[in-house]
Every structure is written in structure tokens, then in C-alpha cells.
Amino acid sequence: MEKNLINALLAIELENFFSIKNKIRLDFRAGNIHTASAKMLSDNVFEWNGQKILKTVGLFGPNAAGKSNIMKTINFCCRMVLDSHAHNQGIVFNFKPFKFDGWDQKPSSFYIDFVCENIEYEYSFKLTTTEILEESLYYYPNNRKAKIFERKGSKYTFGTKGINRPAEVANDTSSTQLYLSVASQKGRNIAKTVYLYFLQTFLLGLVQMQDASIENLFKQEKKIIMKALEVCDSDICDIAVEHKKGFAPVPTPSLDGQQIGFQMQPIDIMRFHTYHRNNPNIPFDFETEESNGTKRIFTILIRLLDVARNKKSMMIDEFDTSMHPHLAQFVIDLVHASESSQLLFTSHNAALIDMDRFRKDQIYFINKKVDGSTDAYSLYDFKDFRETMDATKGYLQGRFDAVPIITSSVATLKQLLKGGIK
């Protein structure tokens, strides 16, 4: 990617997905903070078009508050862009609206504001579990908002510039398909650009160990991966890739297309092996013999280093699971050290809510409301909170609400174990 081109996630809004009832907004535009602490954290932001943009946003809160539902919703909506061009009529979309208060009869909506190759786009859609109701795409080619298309039901309106022969695409778009997804597959220029942003720039999770790209990514980033393992006091001194020939069962159909059996076919099997300082000549199988923490940091870094070097955005749910706190901070610091990459993550680790590491606007609290729905709000919204205060302590004491309420005493738990509580 050219050095002067910027890609950036600016904001996401979600409404009526899973435990999300009322609209929530995650904003990567930095707040108006001019404190000495914010100046010390200048690496946590980058500039685009006169605005400061956050490199990281963390979602904190108790179990079952909805952190993972936020990530699941974003993943679903992005997959709709990538995959809905192949949807058939009659498909039921893979999400559920909020179940209570009649919201299961209301539509759900998604909105994303982002920058792709220095141009800002606003894309949104509204849907039920069986059809697309509305969809729109706007952009700012000269810092002025312009329509590319807008869709309400089966009716479309188009801007004066944008997608070539737009009505032709509309005629080929069903009620279960996003217009953007269909247009991208027909090679329409702006639609293809936006589609590639979702495919290549806004990454939704971690690379899998058997992914074809993992070997090349590992070879490119081996030095820094080994450095990260040193941070967590690992005694791994080397990692190597081995290829073996193997066999896998492949279904064999009959002439009428029915499966009648399996045939063993040769395949290439890629395995990672680790070597440890105390016995550097003995290989260990990475997937079966290394700790969950080692495997976790490996898969995160493989993806995140690509993100950091190529100005991409990424989201990771429970990113510090099975990870030492120092290593979690190493990952955060890696993003802050990049030019303009971004990370959206969820965590239970209260130690990360640290004003020496994060600005107030980088920390979001996710809480369950009385009606069971998910609420999201930023530490920046607490105007009486100063960066000199202990944010971790305040969080654990319930000052920001998003902590589990545990009222059971040891005596109560003893009664519970004895079956004495009815």
C-alpha cells in the first residue's frame, strides 16, 4: 500500500441484534481531550483530514453483558456484505433480534463510517431475518457528501456519479441480497472498492493454523514473534514449518449425484514445530504440545503484524484469553507503535483500564440494563473523571456500573453446596 493512503474505521452503529436493543455507537474519532496525559499518549491516535483517529478501542464489562454479541453482530453484518450476493430466496439470515418488548418484530440496522484509500464512506442497511428493507452508500469525494445509491424496499435512487449502469444491478438484486454485494461481483468500481475494504482491510478475526497464508505471514514476521515469546518468558528458541504428504477421505458420488463412499486422496499437511532451549534438537508439535497462551499469541501476532504494517483494522473478541497481562500490553503497544492500524477488542482484564496506556475515549464499558439489553458507553462520557484518578480501581468498585454484581457470601455458598438454599 502507498505510504500516503489511509484506511480507517471511524464509527459503527448497531441496533436490534441479539442482546443489543437500542442503538449503540462505537466511535474511533478521538474526543476533544487536551490534557497533559493525552499529549503523552500521542501514539494512540493518528491524523486524517484534520481529525484525530483512535488506533485502539477496548470493550470492558462483565460476562453476559453483550461484549461478544457486539463483535458477533459486526461479524455478521460484514459477512452480509461479503456473502449475500450468493443468497437464494427463502434464506433466513443468521442473527436474532432482541427478543423482549416486541423488538423481535422490529427491523435491525447496521451503520459503518470508514475511510478507504483517503475517501470517507458511510454505508448502512436495515433488515429483518428474511429480507433487506433499506440500504445506502454515500461518500465524500471532495469532502462533500454525495449519494452513490439508496434503496428502500425494491425502489432505488442513484447519485449522478458512482456505479456504472446501476439499474442493471438493481434488477439482479433480490430481497435477500445486499445491492453492494451484488454490484461488487459485477465489477462495478466503487462497489468493488468498498467490498475489498471489508474483505482485505477490516479483518474480523484470527488466522487459522491451516490457512494457506499462515506460512508466508510467519516467515515475514518470525523475528518479532520470537521477541513476543521472550516477553512472556517462554523458553521456545525456534519455530519451524514442516510439510508432509498425507491422505484425506474425499466423498465419491455416483452417477446420479448421490454420495456412495469415500476415496483417499493425497494432500499436503503443514505443521508447525517448536524447539526449546533445554533440548533444542527435540521438536514439539505446536498444536498439540504447546500451551493455549503460546498458541493464542502466535495466531494474534500472525494477523496483527499484517494489520500493523499495512494500515488495516482488526477486531478480536476476548483477545487476552490465556495470555499473560504483559503480553496483552505488548500486543496493544504494537498497534500504538504502528502508523495508522486499528484494533477493536474485548477484555475482562481490569488491569488494562490504565490511564498511563489509554485515553479516556479508548475505553468503552459494556453493561446489561434492567431489561436485559446491552448498553455501551465510553469513559469519556464521565466528565467528572480525571486521568489522574485510578480507573482500574474505579471500575472494580462499580463506579462505571459495568462489573458483575455478586452478592453471595462464603456462608451463603456453603449453604448452597449443602443444598440448604431453596
Regions found by a protein language model. Give the residues of each.
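C-terminal lobe/lid and adjacent interdomain/linker elements of RecA-like ASCE P-loop ATPase modules
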Residues: 2-8, 330-422
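Pre-Walker A-like glycine/lysine-rich segment at the N-terminus of P-loop NTPase domains
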Residues: 2-76, 421
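Conserved Walker B
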Residues: 17, 318-323, 350
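Conserved P-loop NTP-binding catalytic core
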Residues: 43-58, 62-64, 71-122, 128-129
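Conserved ABC ATPase signature
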Residues: 56-61, 254-305, 313, 319-323
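P-loop NTPase motor core
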Residues: 101-156, 161, 366, 379-388, ...
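Electropositive, glycine-dotted interaction segments
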Residues: 122-248
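Short alpha-helix of the ABC ATPase nucleotide-binding domain corresponding to the H-loop/switch region
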Residues: 324-329
